[in-house]
Amino acid sequence: MSKRDYYEVLGVEKSASERDIKKAYKRLAMKYHPDRTQGDKAMEEKFKEVQEAYEILTDSQKRAAYDQYGHAGVDPNRGHGGGHGAGDFGDIFGDVFGDIFGGGRGGGRQSRAARGSDLRYNLELSLEEAVRGKSVEIRVPTLAECDTCDGSGAKKGSSAKTCTTCHGQGQVQMRQGFFAVQQACPTCGGKGKIITDPCDVCHGQGRVEKTKTLSVKVPAGVDTGDRIRLSNEGEAGENGAPAGDLYVQVHVKQHKIFERDGNNLYCEVPLSFTRAAIGGEIEVPTLEGKVKLKVTPETQTGKMFRLRNKGVKSVRSGSVGDLICKVVIETPVNLNSRQKELLQELEESMGKGKETAKNRPKESGFFDGVKKFFDDLTN
C-alpha cells in the first residue's frame, strides 16, 4: 500500500512553518494516542503515521530530501541499515551517481553504511513532569558493541585482514564501455577487510542484541513533539564503526484540569451565578498550588481572566507563560423549596417586559429583536 503524503497526514500546507507542523502534530497525537483509543488498531496505525510524518518534516535535511524526492528520499532502506533511522539524503546521489563518477561518493557511502542506526524512544510524561523537568531511567533494546571482541568482530588474538581483491579500498573498478565504474567489492562487501576467524559470540558482526538502561535528563518546559538527542546511544556500528544516536520523543499526557498551548495554560473555572453577579474572590488551581482570583461583578460566562507568570517556563527562552481562566457559570441544581422561593423572588424583583433591560440587557435585547423580526414579516 502506498504511503500518504506527510503534509496531508498532518493536515498542513507544504509551506508550513515548523511551529505549524508542531501544533498539528500535537493535536493529532492527542487524538490518536493509544491511551485514548483503547486498543483500536486502526487508530494506533494513524498515531504511528503521524509520528513518522512529524519526524521527517521537523528535520531540515530530511524535509528537503522528502520535498525533492518524496518517500524515496527518506526511505530507511537506502540508508545505514535497520528499521529505526531515517534515510540519508546523500545516499540518493551515491546510488545514482557514485558508480559512474568514481570513488568520492563510494568512500563516504562505505562509512555511512557501517555506522549504527539511530533509534527512537517514546517517552510519556505528565504535564507536571514536563513543566518541572526530571531525570528518568529508560530501557532501550538495541545492538551494542560485543564485549568479547571489543566490537572488532574477530576472535580474541586475531584480527581482520586486508581484502586482497580491493586492497582495503572497499571498492573495485570495472569498465563499461567508455566509463570506469566504481562498485562495492564483492569479496569484502565494501568493508575493505575480511574476518577469517570470527568471534564466537557476535559471529563477526562486532555487536550483539542487548537492552541498555540509560538515564535521561528531561529539561523543564518540554512539550509534546520535542526530542532529546543522546549522541552515540543508538545502535553500535558494525566492526567498531561509530554508533548511531538515540532520540527520545516526548509525549505529554492529557491533564484533568489544564490544557497547554505553547507556554500558556488554560482551565475552565465553574462559578455560581450569584458569585458571578456580585463578584468577589475565589480560589483557582495552578501547578504551584491554589491562588486567589478576584472576580469582577457582573461577570458573564466565557470571560477570561489572565494570571501572569502562572504558566510554563519556556525551555528555550526562559520566559514564563500565563494561566488563562475561562469562567463557566453554573446553573444550580437539586434546589429545595426555600431556594426556589428565593430565586422566584429574585426573578420577580427584576420586573417584566422593558423593566428587565436594566438587569438583563441581553435577554431584553434578544426578545426585542425577535419581536421586530416577526413585526417585519407581517408588514
From Swiss-Prot:
Keyword Chaperone listed: yes
CDD domains: DnaJ (cd06257), DnaJ_C (cd10747), DnaJ_zf (cd10719)
Description of its domains: The J domain is necessary and sufficient to stimulate DnaK ATPase activity. Zinc center 1 plays an important role in the autonomous, DnaK-independent chaperone activity of DnaJ. Zinc center 2 is essential for interaction with DnaK and for DnaJ activity.
Organism from which the protein derives: Pseudoalteromonas atlantica (strain T6c / ATCC BAA-1087)
Zinc finger map (CR-type): 133-211
Biological process, per Gene Ontology: chaperone cofactor-dependent protein refolding; DNA replication; protein refolding; response to heat
Protein's cellular compartments: Cytoplasm
Manner of cofactor binding, per the entry note: Binds 2 Zn(2+) ions per monomer.
Gene (UniProt): dnaJ
Listed GO CC annotations: cytoplasm
Keywords from the UniProt entry: Chaperone, Cytoplasm, DNA replication, Metal-binding, Repeat, Stress response, Zinc, Zinc-finger
Superkingdom in the source lineage: Bacteria
Domain J: 5-70
SUPFAM superfamilies named among the record's database cross-references: Chaperone J-domain, DnaJ/Hsp40 cysteine-rich domain, HSP40/DnaJ peptide-binding domain
Cofactor: Zn(2+)
Binding residues annotated for Zn(2+) 2, in chain numbering: 163, 166, 185, 188
Family: Belongs to the DnaJ family.
Subunit description: Homodimer.
Name of this chain's protein: Chaperone protein DnaJ
A Pfam family matched in the record: DnaJ_C
GO MF assignments: ATP binding; heat shock protein binding; unfolded protein binding; zinc ion binding
CXXCXGXG motif repeat boundaries on the chain: 146-153, 163-170, 185-192, 199-206
Repeat as UniProt keyword: yes
Function of the molecule: Participates actively in the response to hyperosmotic and heat shock by preventing the aggregation of stress-denatured proteins and by disaggregating proteins, also in an autonomous, DnaK-independent fashion. Unfolded proteins bind initially to DnaJ; upon interaction with the DnaJ-bound protein, DnaK hydrolyzes its bound ATP, resulting in the formation of a stable complex. GrpE releases ADP from DnaK; ATP binding to DnaK triggers the release of the substrate protein, thus completing the reaction cycle.
